[in-house]
């Protein structure tokens, strides 16, 4: 399965939880896919699992420093800083 196949499969998925399961299975087979970690992080964020989302963004950045996870991580930090400064302390 390619990352494009994964994206196509996710188009028919309605819940974040189901998407997380599918992406996690993909990551198990492709542990170096920064894009998959970024996608799962976004689904975790949507499901309310902020710390898991941040961990996935950081993993994606470790795999590929040029990853778009930088944008997701920055947006997450800004949201957390705005909503509750005690929740995230760099």
Where on the chain are the PLM-derived regions?
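Helix-start (N-cap) detector for alpha-helical repeat units in TPR-like alpha-solenoids
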Residues: 3, 34-35, 67-68
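Alpha-helical linker/edge segments of TPR/alpha-solenoid repeat scaffolds
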Residues: 12, 77-90
